């Protein structure tokens, strides 16, 4: 997904370049030039909750009483004010003269600071909560910069799923005294899909809250990295204006996968300083044009509070770091070897559950489960003949089998939301590749596990079918029936809804 769909690209003052002092030094002439130039690029995360509210209540946005009843006085008033400003013919966007970007000088909140009216680099305009207005205009506009709320919601839910299953368990190994570490909720698939509901930040809306955290982390990280790109342009002999506009052109060409954003958010969260995080993220962002393996290995530097050393395999082309958690070992690896899913790697590290692909390297995450006291673990699995039956699970197959149920729920929840029209379940031809890639990015370990002896697990089979939609029309029909059967209850994962899904899976196996 491209940057302009994921975020608002705005103009800010030169204070954004403050992070460069820690990278280049306080006396750097480049840093002084940029701060004096006093124009920078800031990436602002879209508020997905507001976007969905705007879209779902499009017919009533001018009804103050109704909006206040639905969302409370503060939120309701904010929505109505944003809508009325967006419809006002006299509404004037504050635009940066240098870049043509929307101005976003941060004051005490998300609106413009009072300094914006006096800033020489920007068109004069009255301070107001401009971000809500711009989000509303994008949510309701036809064409142009219209945000496809279905796809962007699905994208962020995929990012959330990857982050909470791959990276957040590792945060327990970070220094407990660090102020950068925050309480991150694990995925709770038995609760309703809060991502597609409103912006009420309480315990029952943990998914949306986590999406806000991830989008903010990503925006902060990208903003910091952009400042280093501008500094680099300046060293190439360009002036400040040209440097800024060159970076802006580059920024608008970027695309991201959910797994890459999850990785960037994790690095930004756990790195000791913003400056160090920016350098590390640079290794990730620039990997597509560089095969400098030592630079890419830097993303492995912060795995635990003991700063476990990065180790190399015998071939010298694979670096890894492992963290043990009782009967589970998490291993992050970077390799230049294209055959990263070989038996040699699996035997050493366990089940491959996440892949971030670069042009010259692969970032991999493995999980290995060790049976207690050398015994085989058993779990319950739904069956069409018996409601529950005991299935023997080997260490190699335990991860995909245990998580297949949640993966199916996640995937169907994402998939159903992409096609909200209950009267039609026809998948557009140009959506096949996008759907397949999204599912593959969320659950890359499924294909690697298809040879394991776990085919009797109906959830796992449905997930495999989901990942091969474009190859087999029979699988398409099966999943289509599943979605149609579940459509009325898929958003509210009550016990009844879960029972319906279990029945659907057993019936359409």
Swiss-Prot record:
Any one GO CC term of the record: host cell plasmodesma
Entry keywords, A to Z: Host cell junction, Host cytoplasm, Transport, Viral movement protein
Job description of the protein: Transports viral genome to neighboring plant cells directly through plasmosdesmata, without any budding. The movement protein allows efficient cell to cell propagation, by bypassing the host cell wall barrier. Increases virus accumulation and symptom severity.
UniProt subcellular location: Host cell junction, Host plasmodesma; Host cytoplasm
Official protein name in the record: Movement protein
Entry's Gene Ontology BP terms: transport of virus in host, cell to cell
Taxonomy, superkingdom: Viruses
